[in-house]
């Protein structure tokens, strides 16, 4: 498969030369790697890393090398989720409810989905976050995604419906990038897929490519028993027009969950 158009990687700054004081190591090439929290981190001496992981050495040195490698893998996995800088600080605790019962309920449903992800993953159980624009759906979806990546080492991705369609459309125009088959396989492969902004376009009966494409994505994950989270400002009655009635059935099957977001926009003064 060609390189991903949907799952980003950490940025890297131009490499430089550093010097290791360990006997026989000397100079090595180092680079700055972007961190999920917004910082940058320089890579260490590769010979020191290799020796710590492969040769007999002090247990604390070996443990530190393993911890560093795991931190690098986690950083890559978090970047690959596609969570943008605006939503990287979104957690369940930073979701402001102001003791509003509807907000507390939505927060609770999403938190439980994340904490019980192992069961939902085995069942391929979907979750729909439906409600008004700007009331925290993406915030809580990103909180779920970060939790399952950090706690379960899951592979996840959040992507808008429009971005899926654009990537597939681009694949028809060029032989240089991934094909439609590659893109659909990538969307099917992740442990948890979040499809955001479903229903933002105006449906065109008989000419609308989006519902059939989203149905294909959802159905493929359904066949593989992999969970999907869908975010939309449409309600349950309107949503089938944007994903197809069969895809709606797939999302409801096997105890599919729904978190209703029934309050007005919270974007003024906060992340939604």
Regions inferred by a protein language model and the residue ranges of each:
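Short cysteine-rich clusters marking metal-coordination/redox-active sites
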Residues: 17-23, 45-48
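Cys/His-rich microdomains that often coordinate metals
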Residues: 24-32, 49-52
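Interdomain "pre-motor" coupling segment immediately N-terminal to P-loop NTPase/helicase cores
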Residues: 36-84
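N-terminal pre-Walker A segment at the start of P-loop NTPase domains
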Residues: 93-118
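Short glycine-rich substrate-engagement loop in P-loop NTPases that contacts/grips substrate
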Residues: 102-110, 145-189, 208
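Walker A/P-loop nucleotide-binding motif
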Residues: 119-141
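Walker B catalytic acidic pair
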Residues: 196-198
């Amino acid at each position: 498969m060609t390189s991903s158009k949907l799952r980003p990687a950490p940025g890297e700054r131009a490499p430089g030369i550093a010097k290791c004081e360990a006997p026989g190591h000397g100079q090595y090439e180092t680079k700055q790697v972007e961190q999920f929290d917004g910082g940058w981190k320089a890579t260490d001496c590769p010979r020191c890393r290799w020796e710590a992981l492969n040769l007999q050495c002090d247990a604390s040195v070996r443990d530190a090398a393993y911890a560093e490698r795991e931190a690098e893998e986690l950083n890559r996995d978090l970047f690959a989720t596609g969570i943008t800088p605006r939503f990287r600080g979104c957690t369940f605790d930073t979701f402001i409810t102001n003791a509003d019962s509807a907000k507390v309920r939505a927060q609770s449903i999403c938190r439980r989905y994340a904490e019980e992800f192992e069961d939902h993953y085995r069942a391929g159980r979907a979750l729909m976050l439906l409600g008004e624009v700007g009331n925290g759906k993406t915030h809580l979806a990103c909180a779920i995604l970060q939790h399952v990546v950090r706690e379960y080492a899951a592979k996840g991705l959040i992507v808008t419906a429009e971005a899926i369609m654009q990537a597939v459309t681009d694949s028809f125009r060029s032989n240089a990038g991934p094909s439609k088959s590659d893109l659909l396989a990538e969307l099917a492969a992740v442990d948890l897929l979040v499809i955001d902004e479903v229903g933002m376009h105006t449906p065109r009966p008989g000419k609308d490519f989006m519902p059939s494409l989203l149905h294909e994505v959802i159905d493929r994950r359904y066949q593989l028993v992999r969970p999907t989270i869908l975010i939309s400002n449409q309600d349950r009655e309107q949503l089938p027009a944007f994903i197809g009635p069969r895809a709606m059935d797939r999302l409801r099957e096997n105890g599919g969950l729904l978190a209703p977001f029934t309050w007005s926009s919270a974007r003024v003064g906060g992340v939604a």
